Amino acid sequence: MITVNTLQKMKAAGEKIVMLTAYESSFAALMDDAGVDVLLVGDSLGMAVQGRQSTLPVSLRDMCYHTECVARGAKNAMIVSDLPFGAYQQSKEQAFAAAAELMAAGAHMVKLEGGVWMAETTEFLQMRGIPVCAHIGLTPQSVFAFGGYKVQGRGGKAQALLNDAKAHDEAGAAVVLMECVPAELAKKVTETVSCPTIGIGAGADCDGQVLVMHDMLGIFPGKTAKFVKNFMRGQSSIQAAVRAYVAEVKAKTFPAAEHIFAD
Protein backbone atom coordinates (compact mmCIF):
# COMPACT_ATOMS: atom_id res chain seq x y z
CA MET A 1 0.00 0.00 0.00
CA ILE A 2 1.19 3.51 -0.83
CA THR A 3 2.05 5.53 2.28
CA VAL A 4 3.55 8.92 3.14
CA ASN A 5 6.92 7.17 3.35
CA THR A 6 6.42 5.73 -0.14
CA LEU A 7 5.84 9.22 -1.55
CA GLN A 8 9.00 10.53 0.16
CA LYS A 9 11.03 7.67 -1.31
CA MET A 10 9.59 8.36 -4.76
CA LYS A 11 10.63 12.01 -4.52
CA ALA A 12 14.13 11.00 -3.43
CA ALA A 13 14.42 8.49 -6.28
CA GLY A 14 13.04 10.87 -8.91
CA GLU A 15 10.05 8.61 -9.62
CA LYS A 16 6.97 10.60 -10.57
CA ILE A 17 3.87 10.30 -8.39
CA VAL A 18 0.59 9.74 -10.25
CA MET A 19 -2.56 11.20 -8.72
CA LEU A 20 -6.06 11.16 -10.20
CA THR A 21 -9.45 12.13 -8.81
CA ALA A 22 -11.90 9.38 -7.92
CA TYR A 23 -15.41 9.64 -6.56
CA GLU A 24 -16.77 6.08 -6.39
CA SER A 25 -15.70 2.47 -5.92
CA SER A 26 -15.69 1.13 -9.49
CA PHE A 27 -13.43 3.84 -10.86
CA ALA A 28 -11.28 3.65 -7.73
CA ALA A 29 -10.70 -0.06 -8.34
CA LEU A 30 -9.96 0.53 -12.03
CA MET A 31 -7.45 3.31 -11.28
CA ASP A 32 -5.83 1.29 -8.52
CA ASP A 33 -5.37 -1.63 -10.91
CA ALA A 34 -3.97 0.71 -13.58
CA GLY A 35 -1.18 1.86 -11.29
CA VAL A 36 -2.41 5.23 -10.00
CA ASP A 37 -0.45 5.97 -6.81
CA VAL A 38 -2.85 8.41 -5.15
CA LEU A 39 -6.62 8.75 -5.48
CA LEU A 40 -7.89 12.25 -4.72
CA VAL A 41 -11.48 12.41 -3.51
CA GLY A 42 -11.77 16.01 -4.58
CA ASP A 43 -14.44 18.57 -3.85
CA SER A 44 -14.27 18.91 -7.64
CA LEU A 45 -17.10 16.39 -7.40
CA GLY A 46 -19.32 19.42 -6.93
CA MET A 47 -18.74 20.34 -10.57
CA ALA A 48 -17.83 16.99 -12.14
CA VAL A 49 -20.50 14.87 -10.43
CA GLN A 50 -23.13 17.20 -8.96
CA GLY A 51 -23.20 19.67 -11.86
CA ARG A 52 -22.58 22.77 -9.74
CA GLN A 53 -20.80 25.91 -10.89
CA SER A 54 -18.08 25.75 -8.22
CA THR A 55 -16.78 23.55 -5.40
CA LEU A 56 -18.18 25.78 -2.65
CA PRO A 57 -21.55 24.03 -2.07
CA VAL A 58 -19.93 20.62 -1.42
CA SER A 59 -20.55 19.50 2.16
CA LEU A 60 -18.52 17.44 4.61
CA ARG A 61 -21.27 14.84 4.39
CA ASP A 62 -20.73 14.67 0.60
CA MET A 63 -16.99 14.25 1.07
CA CYS A 64 -17.37 11.49 3.67
CA TYR A 65 -19.83 9.61 1.47
CA HIS A 66 -17.58 9.67 -1.59
CA THR A 67 -14.50 8.87 0.51
CA GLU A 68 -16.25 5.75 1.81
CA CYS A 69 -17.11 4.74 -1.76
CA VAL A 70 -13.53 5.18 -3.00
CA ALA A 71 -12.10 3.36 0.02
CA ARG A 72 -14.18 0.29 -0.82
CA GLY A 73 -12.63 0.10 -4.30
CA ALA A 74 -8.99 0.96 -3.62
CA LYS A 75 -6.54 -1.68 -2.40
CA ASN A 76 -3.07 -0.23 -2.92
CA ALA A 77 -3.45 3.47 -3.73
CA MET A 78 -3.32 6.19 -1.10
CA ILE A 79 -6.60 8.07 -0.61
CA VAL A 80 -6.51 11.84 -0.11
CA SER A 81 -9.78 13.63 0.66
CA ASP A 82 -10.55 17.33 0.41
CA LEU A 83 -11.69 19.31 3.39
CA PRO A 84 -14.68 21.18 1.90
CA PHE A 85 -15.26 24.92 2.04
CA GLY A 86 -16.48 26.05 5.45
CA ALA A 87 -15.40 22.89 7.26
CA TYR A 88 -11.94 24.02 8.38
CA GLN A 89 -11.31 27.75 7.93
CA GLN A 90 -12.93 28.90 11.18
CA SER A 91 -10.45 27.29 13.58
CA LYS A 92 -7.86 24.56 13.97
CA GLU A 93 -10.28 22.65 16.15
CA GLN A 94 -12.99 22.79 13.48
CA ALA A 95 -10.45 21.52 10.94
CA PHE A 96 -9.48 18.60 13.18
CA ALA A 97 -13.09 17.56 13.72
CA ALA A 98 -13.76 17.56 9.96
CA ALA A 99 -10.47 15.82 9.15
CA ALA A 100 -11.19 13.12 11.73
CA GLU A 101 -14.49 12.37 9.98
CA LEU A 102 -12.74 12.01 6.63
CA MET A 103 -10.08 9.74 8.11
CA ALA A 104 -12.78 7.60 9.70
CA ALA A 105 -14.46 7.38 6.28
CA GLY A 106 -11.29 5.88 4.78
CA ALA A 107 -8.95 8.75 3.88
CA HIS A 108 -5.22 8.39 4.50
CA MET A 109 -4.57 12.13 4.17
CA VAL A 110 -6.65 15.31 3.96
CA LYS A 111 -6.17 18.26 1.62
CA LEU A 112 -6.75 21.87 2.61
CA GLU A 113 -6.45 25.06 0.59
CA GLY A 114 -4.54 28.17 1.57
CA GLY A 115 -1.13 29.73 1.99
CA VAL A 116 0.90 30.90 4.98
CA TRP A 117 -2.24 31.62 6.98
CA MET A 118 -3.24 27.93 6.88
CA ALA A 119 0.16 26.54 7.89
CA GLU A 120 -0.80 26.65 11.57
CA THR A 121 -3.73 24.36 10.78
CA THR A 122 -1.42 22.03 8.85
CA GLU A 123 0.83 21.76 11.90
CA PHE A 124 -2.13 21.26 14.25
CA LEU A 125 -3.44 18.36 12.17
CA GLN A 126 -0.15 16.59 11.49
CA MET A 127 0.82 16.75 15.17
CA ARG A 128 -2.40 14.88 15.88
CA GLY A 129 -1.71 12.11 13.40
CA ILE A 130 -3.46 13.46 10.30
CA PRO A 131 -1.22 13.82 7.21
CA VAL A 132 -1.90 17.00 5.25
CA CYS A 133 -1.71 17.89 1.57
CA ALA A 134 -1.45 21.69 1.33
CA HIS A 135 -3.05 23.11 -1.84
CA ILE A 136 -1.56 26.46 -2.93
CA GLY A 137 -1.61 28.63 -6.06
CA LEU A 138 -5.05 28.64 -7.64
CA THR A 139 -7.29 27.42 -4.82
CA PRO A 140 -10.78 26.79 -6.25
CA GLN A 141 -12.54 27.46 -2.94
CA SER A 142 -11.31 31.07 -3.30
CA VAL A 143 -12.31 31.44 -6.96
CA PHE A 144 -14.61 34.39 -6.32
CA ALA A 145 -11.89 36.22 -4.38
CA PHE A 146 -9.49 35.63 -7.28
CA GLY A 147 -12.05 36.88 -9.80
CA GLY A 148 -11.98 33.63 -11.76
CA TYR A 149 -9.69 30.72 -12.57
CA LYS A 150 -6.38 32.51 -13.17
CA VAL A 151 -2.70 31.58 -13.05
CA GLN A 152 -1.17 32.45 -9.68
CA GLY A 153 2.37 33.43 -8.70
CA ARG A 154 3.38 35.45 -11.73
CA GLY A 155 5.79 38.36 -11.51
CA GLY A 156 5.97 39.99 -8.10
CA LYS A 157 3.70 37.38 -6.55
CA ALA A 158 6.18 34.53 -6.99
CA GLN A 159 7.90 35.03 -3.64
CA ALA A 160 4.59 34.96 -1.79
CA LEU A 161 3.74 31.57 -3.30
CA LEU A 162 7.20 30.24 -2.45
CA ASN A 163 6.65 31.45 1.11
CA ASP A 164 3.32 29.60 1.19
CA ALA A 165 5.03 26.35 0.21
CA LYS A 166 7.86 26.80 2.71
CA ALA A 167 5.43 27.58 5.54
CA HIS A 168 3.45 24.38 4.96
CA ASP A 169 6.61 22.32 4.52
CA GLU A 170 8.01 23.63 7.80
CA ALA A 171 4.64 22.94 9.45
CA GLY A 172 4.96 19.28 8.50
CA ALA A 173 2.83 19.00 5.36
CA ALA A 174 3.17 15.57 3.75
CA VAL A 175 2.54 16.97 0.26
CA VAL A 176 2.30 20.41 -1.36
CA LEU A 177 -0.08 20.59 -4.33
CA MET A 178 0.29 23.52 -6.74
CA GLU A 179 -2.41 24.52 -9.21
CA CYS A 180 -2.02 26.90 -12.16
CA VAL A 181 1.47 28.07 -11.29
CA PRO A 182 4.23 29.06 -13.76
CA ALA A 183 6.48 26.09 -14.47
CA GLU A 184 9.72 27.75 -13.37
CA LEU A 185 8.22 28.80 -10.05
CA ALA A 186 6.83 25.31 -9.44
CA LYS A 187 10.28 23.89 -10.17
CA LYS A 188 11.83 26.24 -7.61
CA VAL A 189 9.25 25.24 -5.01
CA THR A 190 9.90 21.55 -5.67
CA GLU A 191 13.64 22.05 -5.23
CA THR A 192 13.12 24.09 -2.05
CA VAL A 193 10.68 22.03 0.02
CA SER A 194 11.48 18.66 1.57
CA CYS A 195 8.03 17.15 0.98
CA PRO A 196 6.81 15.87 -2.40
CA THR A 197 5.02 18.31 -4.70
CA ILE A 198 2.09 17.51 -6.99
CA GLY A 199 1.21 19.76 -9.90
CA ILE A 200 -1.88 20.51 -11.94
CA GLY A 201 -1.06 23.15 -14.49
CA ALA A 202 2.27 23.63 -12.68
CA GLY A 203 4.79 22.31 -15.19
CA ALA A 204 6.69 19.06 -15.56
CA ASP A 205 9.18 19.43 -12.71
CA CYS A 206 6.84 18.74 -9.79
CA ASP A 207 7.34 15.40 -8.06
CA GLY A 208 3.97 14.24 -9.39
CA GLN A 209 0.91 15.18 -11.43
CA VAL A 210 -2.85 15.20 -10.86
CA LEU A 211 -5.83 15.65 -13.17
CA VAL A 212 -9.57 15.51 -12.68
CA MET A 213 -10.79 12.15 -13.99
CA HIS A 214 -13.55 13.69 -16.11
CA ASP A 215 -11.04 16.05 -17.75
CA MET A 216 -8.50 13.36 -18.66
CA LEU A 217 -11.30 11.21 -20.11
CA GLY A 218 -12.63 14.12 -22.16
CA ILE A 219 -16.14 13.96 -20.71
CA PHE A 220 -16.35 17.24 -18.82
CA PRO A 221 -18.54 19.77 -20.67
CA GLY A 222 -17.33 23.26 -21.43
CA LYS A 223 -13.96 24.79 -22.18
CA THR A 224 -10.92 22.57 -21.60
CA ALA A 225 -8.16 24.03 -19.44
CA LYS A 226 -4.71 24.50 -20.98
CA PHE A 227 -3.16 21.91 -18.66
CA VAL A 228 -5.61 19.13 -19.59
CA LYS A 229 -4.93 16.30 -22.03
CA ASN A 230 -7.67 13.95 -23.25
CA PHE A 231 -6.12 10.52 -22.66
CA MET A 232 -9.24 8.75 -23.92
CA ARG A 233 -8.51 9.86 -27.48
CA GLY A 234 -7.15 6.90 -29.43
CA GLN A 235 -7.86 4.40 -26.64
CA SER A 236 -10.40 1.57 -26.68
CA SER A 237 -11.26 1.58 -22.98
CA ILE A 238 -11.22 3.77 -19.88
CA GLN A 239 -8.64 1.51 -18.27
CA ALA A 240 -6.37 1.93 -21.30
CA ALA A 241 -6.74 5.70 -21.03
CA VAL A 242 -5.83 5.66 -17.34
CA ARG A 243 -2.85 3.41 -18.05
CA ALA A 244 -1.72 5.85 -20.76
CA TYR A 245 -1.92 8.71 -18.25
CA VAL A 246 0.09 6.73 -15.70
CA ALA A 247 2.70 5.81 -18.31
CA GLU A 248 3.13 9.38 -19.57
CA VAL A 249 3.49 10.84 -16.08
CA LYS A 250 6.00 8.15 -15.09
CA ALA A 251 7.93 8.67 -18.35
CA LYS A 252 7.91 12.45 -17.78
CA THR A 253 6.26 13.10 -21.14
CA PHE A 254 3.15 14.62 -19.54
CA PRO A 255 2.72 17.49 -19.10
CA ALA A 256 4.21 18.61 -22.41
CA ALA A 257 5.07 22.16 -23.45
CA GLU A 258 1.51 22.93 -24.58
CA HIS A 259 0.16 22.18 -21.08
CA ILE A 260 2.52 24.52 -19.22
CA PHE A 261 2.13 28.14 -18.06
CA ALA A 262 5.06 30.52 -18.45
CA ASP A 263 5.87 33.35 -16.04
UniProtKB/Swiss-Prot annotation:
State the free-text cofactor note: Binds 1 Mg(2+) ion per subunit.
**Name this protein carries in UniProt:** 3-methyl-2-oxobutanoate hydroxymethyltransferase
Q: Fill in the subunit field for this protein.
A: Homodecamer; pentamer of dimers.
* One Gene Ontology cellular component: cytoplasm
Single GO term (MF): 3-methyl-2-oxobutanoate hydroxymethyltransferase activity
Pathway assignment: Cofactor biosynthesis; (R)-pantothenate biosynthesis; (R)-pantoate from 3-methyl-2-oxobutanoate: step 1/2
What positions does the entry give for 3-methyl-2-oxobutanoate binding?
43-44, 82, 111
A GO biological-process term: cellular response to iron ion
**What is this protein's gene name?**
panB
Cofactor list: Mg(2+)
Q: Which family does it belong to?
A: Belongs to the PanB family.
EC number(s) of the enzyme? 2.1.2.11
This protein's major location comes to cytoplasm
Which species is the source of this protein?
Neisseria gonorrhoeae (strain ATCC 700825 / FA 1090)
Specify the enzyme's EC class, one word: transferase
Looking up PANTHER family in the UniProt record yields: 3-METHYL-2-OXOBUTANOATE HYDROXYMETHYLTRANSFERASE
Q: Which reaction equations make up its catalytic activity?
A: 3-methyl-2-oxobutanoate + (6R)-5,10-methylene-5,6,7,8-tetrahydrofolate + H2O = 2-dehydropantoate + (6S)-5,6,7,8-tetrahydrofolate
Role played: Catalyzes the reversible reaction in which hydroxymethyl group from 5,10-methylenetetrahydrofolate is transferred onto alpha-ketoisovalerate to form ketopantoate.
Q: Which UniProt keywords apply?
A: Cytoplasm, Magnesium, Metal-binding, Pantothenate biosynthesis, Transferase
